[in-house]
Design a protein with these regions (language model features):
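N-terminal organellar transit peptides
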Residues: 1-287
Length: 287
């Protein structure tokens, strides 16, 4: 998010991007496109791989061309998910996650959409290798959630920052006058210290989003909200073994391992007389 903010500030100042940065952005785009094509190749045998890479924002695609392909738009992801649900040639969906999280906007809606989608087709997620914050919210909404052996998941929490530039501006000889209508319109502005009322309100908004986050995790992982808040939901990112011990994931496996498991499940389900017991045994293979 800081990187996106830096791009916006550079735009507003009319400063062009440095040539070295543009070269790096193009190189990153090639790498990510290669990874997406690899995922597309895996989309055989009725398994569609849906990538979720980079910072999560509601409309991250808007700055993709100038800040690098380092974001996922929840709107575009939802659209792609709907298309796969409607595609009769797709029997299972695998979400390939490598994301530090991002903005809260659009995440709850996407998580709800995944919950609805899994009632129609299996939706499996794998942290490959990071699913933190908003990305964990999304991943834990899947039917099953895995993490790679060297991967990490977590950062269940919400934060917001206020920066007070008043002293720096004063030292620079700059005085800012805000002209507004509405009692709280300029509350929390960066040109004056944050007062107690504004901080209390900002904290209440953070608490509201945290409540929604922990509720979604509890639903996705099938545990009480209290277990989330008192354990996995305290903001830390955990490695694979610790995450499995905390019931944050269903197993530890590479992307290829998960795809193999999904193919086995598809073959078993296609056989006459496939039983729930056999399906349960297959599900335990990665634990």
């Amino acid at each position: 998010l800081n990187a996106l903010a830096a791009v916006v500030m550079r735009w507003s100042a009319g400063i062009p991007a440095e040539s070295e940065n543009m070269i790096r952005i193009q190189a990153d785009r090639v790498i990510r496109e290669s990874r997406r094509q690899t995922a597309a190749v895996q989309s055989s045998g009725g398994i569609a791989v849906l990538p979720l890479y980079g910072v999560v924002t509601q409309r991250g695609n808007m700055v993709d061309d100038v800040s690098g392909p380092g974001s996922t738009s929840t709107q575009q992801f939802s659209s792609a998910l709907r298309q796969l649900i409607a595609d009769d040639t797709v029997g299972q969906i695998l979400i390939d996650i490598d994301s530090p999280g991002g903005s809260v906007y659009g995440v709850a809606e996407l998580a709800d959409e995944i919950q609805s989608a899994r009632a129609q087709k299996p939706v499996i997620a794998v942290a490959n290798s990071l699913a933190a914050s908003a990305a964990y919210w999304i991943g834990c909404s899947a039917s099953e959630f895995y993490v790679t052996p060297g991967g990490e998941v977590g950062s269940i929490g919400v934060w917001q920052a206020h920066q007070d530039y008043s002293k720096a501006l004063e030292d620079a000889g700059v005085k800012t006058t805000l002209i507004s209508a509405g009692r709280f319109k300029v509350e929390g502005n960066p040109y004056s210290p944050l007062d107690a009322d504004a901080q209390s309100f900002m904290q209440s908004r953070v608490d509201d989003y945290y409540a929604a986050f922990t509720k979604a995790v509890a639903r996705g992982r099938g545990v009480p909200i209290s277990q989330v808040r008192e354990g996995m939901g305290q903001g830390r990112v955990l490695g694979a073994d610790a995450a499995l011990a905390q019931n944050m994931v269903d197993g530890i496996a590479t992307l290829d391992d998960v795809i193999k498991k999904m193919r086995r499940n598809a073959r078993q389900l296609s056989k006459p007389g496939a039983t729930r017991l056999r399906q349960a045994r297959d599900a335990l293979a990665l634990l």
